[in-house]
Structure formats: structure tokens, C-alpha cells
Amino acid sequence: QGIASALAAGAVAAQMGTAFILCPESAANASYRENLLSVRAGETRLTSVFSGRPARGMVNRLVRYGEADGSPVPADYPLADDAAKQLNALAATSGCHEFAAQWAGQGAALSRALPAADLVDVLMTELNHVQG
């Protein structure tokens, strides 16, 4: 229905990157996949904490800290991006993935773990059904 809504609103296409993160062809790590299958997928927001530029992602510890009252404003891109990647890499060595940029759109909770070709077929079938 999301694709049909975008097209009905005048768009010529719909961006659906998040829909493909759970596909086996994706390079997403296990933590990213687990979060997309959890309640976390229902809480996304635009933030510039990770990169210094606004982008939508799942809320984690870094987002909560970086957006809290009194937190410093993120550095401009690419400094914020480099710093966040280094912080995440260090935390990940201890098994902590609370500092990873896990980008996700507003429909993240609708993600499905299907091979990419199958997902495209399903999305087209659903679009055709909605459009009648």
C-alpha cells in the first residue's frame, strides 16, 4: 500500500531501501537484521547524530545520547560520520551495537526476510492488488 500511496500522491517511484535489508543478498550484519525484526523497527527518526547530515534510522543509545538536552551538536559531515564509525567499531569489538548507524525508513517494521527477487515479486503482486 505504501508504493500505491506514493504513486497516487504524484511520485513516479518509491524508495524502498529498508525493504531489502533483510534479504539474504544484503550485507547487513546480524545486529541490524535482529533490530529490524524487533520492536525497534517501529521507532525510527530523522537524526544527524551519526553523520552530521539528517537521515532516518532506528533509535539506539547513540541517538538518545546525541539528541538529549545538553548534548553537543554533531560535527559537520564527514567529521561526525568518521567519529561515529570509529565509536561503533570500538563498541562492536565488545559486542555492543548500540552505536551503529542502522538506517531505516518509516516502513521498517514491514520488512520481510525474502530473497530480493522474491521480494520484488511480492511487492509487485501487492501493488497490483491494491491498484485493482
Where do the PLM segments sit?
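Conserved active-site-proximal phosphate/metal-binding subdomains
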Residues: 2-132
